[in-house]
C-alpha cells in the first residue's frame, strides 16, 4: 500500500489518543494520530515521525501521523488501518477464488473470508508495533475484542473452516510475534487454545518504505 504524500516532522507531545503536536518547518502542527493505542514506547519527545498529507481541505487537521523512527530499530509504521490494507493486497495475489472483507461470523466481524474451490477460509489480522529485545508482542494494550476473535476462529475451525490469525509486523528486522501476557494473559491463553484447535498463526514480515508498507514474507508461528 502507498500513501498519497508524506511529510516529515518531530514529535512533541500527545494530548490525547487522537491528536499529537508535531514540529514541522519550525512551527508546531496539531496532527491526527492513526492509532488510538498507547504507543508510549514509540512516541517519545524529539522522535522523527512521518505524516500523510490529507487531501481533504475541510479537515481540522492537515496531517495523519503514520510512522515513527525507533532508535536501534528503524521506522515503525503505526497506522492501525495499514495492516488490513496490506493484507487485502497480499491476499489478492494468493490464488483465492473469492475474498470478502469484514465477514460476519457468530457474534464477530472477522477481517477476511476467502474461498478456494470448496474450501472456506477465515483470517483475522492484527498489527504489531510493539518490539522488545528484537521480538514483536501483541497486544500493546488489553483487547477484549481480540480475545473474542480468537475464540470465534477456534470455533469456526472446528466446524470446517480453515482459519488463521495473521500478525502484520509493521517494522523491519522482526520475524516473530509473541502474546503480550504481561499486558493481557487472556490473549495468550486464547491464542494457545486457537492453535490447539488448528488455527494457523502467521507472521507477515513487511518492508517499511517512506510512503509505503508491503508484505514481503510469510512465516508460520
Protein language model annotation of sequence segments:
Residues 9, 110-140, 153:
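Conserved catalytic cores of phosphodiester-cleaving nucleases, focusing on short active-site segments
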Residues 27-41:
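Beta-strand/loop nucleic-acid-binding surfaces
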Amino acid at each position: 500500500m502507498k500513501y498519497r504524500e508524506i511529510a516529515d516532522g518531530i514529535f512533541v507531545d500527545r494530548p490525547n489518543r487522537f491528536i499529537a503536536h508535531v514540529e514541522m518547518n519550525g512551527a508546531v502542527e496539531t496532527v491526527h494520530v492513526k492509532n488510538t493505542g498507547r504507543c508510549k514506547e514509540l512516541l517519545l519527545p524529539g522522535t522523527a515521525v512521518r505524516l500523510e498529507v490529507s487531501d481533504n481541505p475541510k479537515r481540522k487537521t492537515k496531517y495523519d501521523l503514520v510512522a515513527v523512527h525507533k532508535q536501534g530499530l528503524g521506522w515503525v509504521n503505526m497506522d492501525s488501518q495499514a495492516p488490513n490494507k496490506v493484507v487485502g493486497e497480499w491476499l489478492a495475489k494468493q490464488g483465492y477464488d473469492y475474498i470478502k472483507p469484514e465477514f460476519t461470523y457468530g457474534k464477530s466481524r472477522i477481517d477476511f473470508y476467502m474461498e478456494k474451490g470448496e474450501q472456506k477460509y477465515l483470517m483475522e489480522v492484527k498489527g504489531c508495533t510493539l518490539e522488545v529485545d528484537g521480538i514483536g508482542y501483541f497486544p500493546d494494550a488489553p483487547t477484549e475484542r481480540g480475545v473474542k476473535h480468537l475464540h470465534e476462529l477456534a470455533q469456526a475451525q472446528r466446524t470446517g473452516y480453515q482459519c488463521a490469525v495473521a500478525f502484520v509486523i509493521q517494522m523491519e528486522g522482526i520475524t516473530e510475534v509473541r502474546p503480550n501476557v504481561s499486558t493481557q494473559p487472556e490473549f495468550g491463553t486464547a491464542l494457545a487454545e486457537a492453535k490447539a484447535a488448528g488455527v494457523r498463526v502467521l507472521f507477515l514480515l513487511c518492508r517499511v518504505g517512506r510512503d509505503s508498507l508491503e508484505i514481503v514474507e510469510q512465516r508460520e508461528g
